[in-house]
Amino acid sequence: MKNSNERLNDAFYALKKATCSVRKSVPGVYKMFGTEDRLLYVGKAKDLKKRLSSYLSINRMSVNVYTMVKQIVRLEITVTENETEALLLEAKLIKSLKPKYNIIMRDDKFYPYILFSKHKYPRIVLHREKRSEGRYTGLYGPFLSSVMTRHIIATIKKAFLLRSCPDNFFATRARPCIEYEIKNCSAPCMQKITEEDYAKAVQMAHKALTGQSKEIQCELFEMMCRFSNNQDYESAIVCRDRLHALKSMKECMGFQTGIHGDVDFIAVYKRQDLYCMQVVFFRDGVNYGSQPYFIESVGNASDADIVNMFMLQIYNDFPSVVYVDLPSDYDTNIMSTAIKQLMKREVDIRLPATRDELKAMGLARNYAMEALNRRVRNTAQDTDLEEFATFFDLLKAPERIEIYDNSHISGTHPYGVMVVCGKDGLLKKEYRKFKINTVTNGDDCSMMHEVISRRFKEIPDVLPDFILIDGGRGQRSAVYGELSRLGIPFACIAKGPGRVAGTEVFYFSNGEKLSLDPASKLMHFLCRLRDEAHRFAITSHRKSRDGKLQFSTLLNDIPGIGKTKGKAILAYFGSIQAMKHARVEEISKVPGISLKLAKRVADYLKESQTTLRA
């Protein structure tokens, strides 16, 4: 087998041979092949000789280019009539042959969408997984910011009174929830709105999200005037509030950008050899969200070449206009001509020039920077998981790690928690709290046994690749039987001598005790996981403790309301937050509560509301 230097010499020989075979200043396409004739890379060049020569400058090579070049065994050259023909041929070869180093990586798993569920009365929710066919009647996005997405959802709910509750909650309601009371929902669960009227509201929401809100605004304005003329001021105020909500949503989604028609903006952001191409979509002038793509550059292609190759690979149907984030000497005619030949229609490739165009491209560039920085962070997360697998002797990097901890004060208000970590970092939607039921003496080991047992009874279908428990030998013994039966590897992390940070020790399932270098990245990663579980456990314990103390103090101070009646009131309304907004008539419906007592409760809650917690 040849060593690294011999392989590099063979690659340089193949490159020199190919370089000598072409005339100066001719455009074309080159294919690089490795051992067993595997296609490594396809590239195009305006000047083939100049481009191929650039691969011979070892001192100017990046690590990625060097890694690819030393695998080259032979090259194939195709000379074309012009650069446009070379661009089209390159795109065709990449799409059909999928070379190893011409991969475009798409990343949409982090980004939020707005989803309308498939239901008689659809709910509107934030959703992070695009591939959910059959589960929705409308899907909008992706949006870069979950904060912006939640604001849009809240605005849509306020404007059209749509529900956002889970289906099981919707199906079991006995009375309208607090969302109805604060005019955020039309309470379809209690038939406060007909199916037909609710469907109309959903349709209006769809139109608003696609920028077709002008006709909705006109209709609402006419209704507002009509209600006002008829002195139905309450209905007129509802229409007015809906108009304000639509205006707020338009500003949030960036409708007022001065961009018209179907337009895409492609921003380019680069860190070393990794590119992020951020595509921001405008359809009918509406900012429809954005999508990042990642390209690892291993060839000596220019930024313009990479953008051109990218566009021809990802688009099946181009919009009318595409703005690209490239220097002013970029030749837009080459790409426009290539698209015309490929699509049989005109597509205008432009550089941004007006204030609105530059503003939109700046937005796309900021998105690209954030997306690429996020990807770099996630690459670091992958490294942590690989080191994790090595230390704990796992066959592969874990995709799901569960971390457990308990919290209590002398056995009171005990809670156990489960924190989850995956390839995308901490998965907070997967966190779980377990109120300890069987242990009252503060025995941490028995508490952990209860938590682990309940976890796999309550959620039997989702198994972790590894479990990390905050504890020592006692916790290991407490959970060993259950986790061994399930075949789940685990370890306990305990404070070291003097409880000094960085001296933690690990008790493996087989009883082995190991430690790590306090300064190692893996130690920091494991301690972060342990600390997150500890934080969540303490928070859960405090909420339980404070809530119970507060509830007890609150209701016991009301004359005529004892422990039994207090529990009945809370059970009826479900939460103190719901009680705050309850009317006297509603409170009097609680069994055992007279109208007089109900008024006393309502007055007391009103006076005390500044001290209440939801």
From Swiss-Prot:
Keywords: Cytoplasm, DNA damage, DNA excision, DNA repair, Excision nuclease, SOS response. Residues 214-249 form the UVR domain. Pfam families: GIY-YIG, HHH_5, UvrC_RNaseH, UvrC_RNaseH_dom. It is found in: Cytoplasm. SMART domains: GIYc, HhH1. Residues 25-103 form the GIY-YIG domain. The keyword Cytoplasm applies. GO terms for biological process: nucleotide-excision repair; SOS response. Disulfide bonds: none annotated. GO terms for molecular function: DNA binding; excinuclease ABC activity. One of its GO terms (cellular component) is cytoplasm. Interacts with UvrB in an incision complex. Belongs to the UvrC family. The UvrABC repair system catalyzes the recognition and processing of DNA lesions. UvrC both incises the 5' and 3' sides of the lesion. The N-terminal half is responsible for the 3' incision and the C-terminal half is responsible for the 5' incision. This is UvrABC system protein C. It comes from Anaplasma phagocytophilum (strain HZ). The lineage of its organism: Bacteria, Pseudomonadati, Pseudomonadota, Alphaproteobacteria, Rickettsiales. The gene is uvrC.
